[in-house]
């Protein structure tokens, strides 16, 4: 477990293997910062190949028993886990906020959306039901089973340190697999605590292992034949690498990358509602969400002029503060590199000729000059060819791309290299229906700015936002974490004929 010293001492974190906190042995460490101050608050060990292989060995041994538990018994562990998390939800939210930088209220949402998938996975006795065909041929029955893969792994990002680990771990465990989690080294304390709570809930030691690390850790998980499937969420270049490497080693993979989510604002939209949606979806969590709205597409010049004027006014009243400030709309970014990246993109937008309506580059929170803060920025008259439209910024920057008509607005997200999510704000049902059917993205919101599906539906983007044919949570999660076995059977009374040398048919 984390060893606590006095406040001036950096905490030493550990791996979690075999139900125990395991110190790192590689000699390599990463720093965990307080985004509010920029100070190092903890050190996290980075596993080498030997440490990662030890975690796989432990998981493989533990899975054999866990996979034999009946689904109801596994579901009870998930239900007890839910109760334990509820008992310390506020402490978890504050811990998450202290390492990531999102507000405590936003951290509560991070945890809640993860727990909803745990609730979904607790229905595993129903979700694992197979198919049955009685008398498919004379005296022959056919049925299918969904069986665990064995050892599976998840590589999760810094921006949702509770939600995405739970999105991956809960269905994987419910299906009878052992799960190895490699969380982000930026904010690893909440994943470690969740692993402790799973153990307290009755999960056998070794069924859930947490290993921190970098590329060597990831490559070990990808190359070891004992790991049968792997999920990833992060940047598109790494998602593509993980997917290709997993496929080359015969593994099932679901990999989710970057996004550039557009929100279409039709002339008939409720403009106040649209502005509220854009402010929250564009600047909430300092824009560090894969489902953040980063491009507003007003249709028509009058709509655009009115929208930009209202956005400018609203941005001026945003409160940026410490992550533990209950009055803050958003807090710091997760790292100094993130602040530098956001500033470079704002500089680039100016160079490309976009109109910088609100400039957040020079924002400093008094008394927190070394914190990882960036102010809200707003660009108008961005064109599709500009890099600030083509590339993911992942920060508090909203771009306005004006569309002359509906068809032009529809083309913008449809032709973009990313295809994660999109939203349309309109009062017209025909327009909304046409948009949802024709737009080329994986998730669509109608008057909903962040269309993250509920737990019993699947989450996933298209094009360069997602690699693999099965998405996260919902029915796809059960398919991803199991293999289908089909059994064809008949009994002695039907076995009296002699040898047959032709392919059997069900006559």
Q: Predicted segment positions?
A:
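Hydrophobic face of amphipathic alpha-helices that form TPR/SEL1-like repeat modules
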Residues: 1-36, 361
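Conserved C-terminal structural/oligomerization subdomain of aldehyde/semialdehyde dehydrogenase
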Residues: 37-43, 227, 264, 312-319, ...
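Residue-level signal for inorganic ion chemistry
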Residues: 38, 74, 96, 118, ...
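Glycine-rich loop-to-alpha-helix module at the N-terminal edge of alpha/beta enzyme cores
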Residues: 39-128, 139
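Short, well-ordered beta-strand elements within core beta-sheets of diverse protein domains
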Residues: 41-47, 62-68, 154, 263-266, ...
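Structural signal for hydrophobic packing residues in well-ordered secondary-structure cores
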Residues: 63, 67, 82-89, 93, ...
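Rossmann-like NAD(P) dinucleotide-binding subdomain of oxidoreductase/dehydrogenase enzymes
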Residues: 130-276, 403, 468
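ALDH superfamily catalytic-core signature
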Residues: 237-383, 412, 446, 493-497, ...
């Amino acid at each position: 477990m984390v060893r606590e010293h006095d406040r001036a001492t950096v905490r030493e974190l550990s791996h979690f293997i075999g139900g125990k906190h395991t110190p790192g042995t590689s000699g390599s460490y990463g720093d965990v910062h307080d985004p509010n101050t920029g100070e190092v608050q903890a050190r996290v060990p980075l596993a080498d190949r030997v440490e990662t292989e030890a975690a796989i060995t432990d998981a493989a041994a533990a899975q054999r028993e866990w996979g034999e538990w009946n689904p109801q018994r596994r579901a009870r562990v998930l239900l007890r886990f839910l109760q334990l998390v509820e008992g310390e939800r506020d402490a978890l939210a504050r811990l998450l906020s202290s390492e990531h930088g999102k507000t405590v209220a936003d951290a509560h949402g991070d945890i809640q959306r993860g727990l909803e998938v745990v609730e979904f996975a607790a229905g595993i006795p129903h979700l694992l039901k197979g198919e049955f065909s009685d008398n498919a041929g004379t005296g022959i029955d056919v049925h299918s089973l969904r069986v665990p893969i064995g050892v599976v792994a998840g590589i999760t990002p810094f921006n949702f340190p509770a939600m995405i680990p739970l999105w991956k771990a809960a269905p994987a465990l419910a299906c009878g697999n052992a799960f190895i989690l490699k969380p982000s080294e930026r904010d690893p304390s909440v994943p470690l605590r969740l692993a402790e709570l799973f153990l307290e809930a009755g999960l056998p030691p070794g069924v859930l292992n947490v290993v921190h690390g970098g590329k060597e850790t990831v490559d070990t998980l990808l190359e070891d034949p004992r790991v049968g499937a792997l999920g990833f969420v992060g940047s598109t270049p790494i998602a593509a690498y993980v997917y290709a490497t997993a496929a080359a080693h015969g593994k099932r993979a679901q990999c989710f990358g970057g996004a550039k989510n557009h929100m279409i604002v039709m002339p008939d939209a409720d403009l106040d509602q649209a502005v509220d949606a854009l402010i929250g979806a564009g600047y909430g969590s300092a824009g560090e969400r894969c489902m953040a709205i980063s491009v507003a597409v007003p249709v028509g010049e009058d709509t655009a002029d009115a929208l930009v004027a209202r956005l400018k006014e609203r941005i001026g009243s945003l409160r940026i503060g410490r992550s533990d400030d209950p009055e803050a709309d958003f807090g710091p970014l997760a790292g100094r590199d993130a602040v530098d990246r956001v500033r470079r993109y704002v500089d680039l937008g100016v160079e490309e000729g976009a109109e910088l309506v609100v400039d957040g580059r020079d924002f400093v929170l008094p008394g927190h000059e070394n914190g990882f803060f960036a102010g809200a920025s707003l660009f108008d008259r961005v064109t599709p060819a500009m890099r600030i439209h083509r590339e993911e910024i992942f920060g508090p920057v909203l771009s306005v791309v004006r569309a002359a008509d509906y068809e032009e607005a529809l083309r913008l997200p449809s032709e973009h290299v990313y295809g994660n999510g999109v939203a349309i704000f309109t009062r017209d049902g025909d327009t909304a229906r046409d948009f949802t059917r024709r737009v080329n993205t994986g998730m669509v919101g109608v008057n909903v700015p962040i269309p993250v599906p509920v737990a019993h539906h699947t989450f996933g983007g298209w094009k360069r936002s997602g690699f693999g044919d099965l998405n996260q949570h919902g029915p796809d999660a059960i398919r991803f974490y199991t293999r289908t076995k089909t059994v064809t059977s008949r009994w002695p009374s039907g076995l009296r004929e002699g040898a047959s040398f032709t392919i059997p048919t069900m006559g």
